[in-house]
Amino acid sequence: MTSSKIEMPGEVKADPAALMASLHLLPSPTLNLEIKHTKIFINNEWQNSESGRVFPVYNPATGEQICEIQEADKVDTDKAVRAARLAFSLGSVWRRMDASERGQLLDKLADLVERDRAVLATMESLNSGKPFLQAFYVDLQGVIKTLRYYAGWADKIHGMTIPVDGDYFTFTRHEPIGVCGQIIPWNFPLLMFAWKIAPALCCGNTVVIKPAEQTPLSALYMGALIKEAGFPPGVVNILPGFGPIVGAAIASHVGIDKIAFTGSTEVGKLIQEAAGRSNLKRVTLELGGKSPNIIFADADLDYAVEQAHQGVFFNQGQCCTAGSRIYVEESIYEEFVRRSVERAKRRVVGSPFDPTTEQGPQIDKKQYNKILELIQSGITEGAKLECGGKGLGRKGFFIEPTVFSNVTDDMRIAKEEIFGPVQEILRFKTVDEVIERANNSDFGLVAAVFTNDINKALTVSSAMQAGTVWINCYNALNAQSPFGGFKMSGNGREMGESGLREYSEVKTVTIKIPQKNS
């Protein structure tokens, strides 16, 4: 999710005609993809579930079953934790490994992802419904950059000496926490896998990770690459299964020292409660959002319209960062709405494997129904439906790009996270007013402001109650920058140097010495 726009080679232009003429330059999906990895991955081995249960995985573009996956449960979780604890034990290969070698393993994993980039992008597209070109150019690029970024950090994490009073020599060590439980969502399955494991492994931890039950395929494929890269057995263990069973077992397991979760605020609360009730494990939560995107009259209007469009419709609107509350200054409101509607009507919805497609299906029937219900609530509560608002086609879970105007702050569509292709456009008059309204939310993940006035930009960005603020851009996420939320959008930070702090403990060591000299 390094950019809200799919960045293609320079020879390939964005307009459909040029795109069609340049198809030979684009990567191609893997035809007749064979799903080889459908079992649980523990101790670098593929295992059946202890219960013998399996669950189906579907293609959201067609509603058809792709395959069946072994369903992990509490017993399998216990096995994975034992493997992770053994791999983390004092004197183990992993604990004795030089930090530089950990970095080399992460770099090797990045090499293997690059080698299999088309396969992984095909798998992401097939399993999650996102356009193949987005998966290839955005998601996979983010995976590779994240792995390489933390590979570079592995031998640069260190403590310091401290000039304490008295005849003592004091220094600090940054040590791995231990076994890390990680639970990832279905909207960016592979990218979130990398966001979670890369800093954890960089610091020397071991991992038990649960992919979303809707999208386990790419995570399981990564298990094979992790083994091929040379990570010791037990360092990474992958448990496909369901949140109330495996997710709950991870959150409450006393053998897990830290948990990281990306998903809904509702589930995040349950995880934090379970972590507290069990062994008070450390918790990092990246949760929901209802992000404000503020457009001032002095902004470049065409650019702001396109960025706002991508900011909410990217990845079928299934982004925690989606800029779904768009506040537009009154003097340009009507024109902004007109151009936004024109752009939404041009958005190409279709097969994820069609290179002209901008928007694929929603992830499943449950999410599809939730989005349509919230769209109906917007109509009922008096917002103006400018375009879209309905499902598309007989197969799959496609929804028309939808734009609402005349939205007010008290409407459900302005307060609740829709997680779908629905743009809500509100109007404002003054800077102070829009700051107060933008901050009047339980969430605080990201915010954005579009203006050519640096004073407005800095005033608004400093006032926003959000972990990330973008000025004249949107979805500008990078491996080097910390990411996380204020308020009910979570706690802790992922990515950047800050992400390392979530996976290490600082130990102070003090030695009595005969005499200290400066």
From Swiss-Prot:
GO terms for molecular function: aldehyde dehydrogenase (NAD+) activity; all-trans-retinol dehydrogenase (NAD+) activity; retinal dehydrogenase activity. Its EC number is 1.2.1.36. NAD(+) binds at residues 184-186, 210-213, 264-266, 366-370, 417. It comes from the Eukaryota. The active site is at residues 286, 320. Keywords: Cytoplasm, Lipid metabolism, NAD, Oxidoreductase. The keyword NAD applies. This is Retinal dehydrogenase 2.
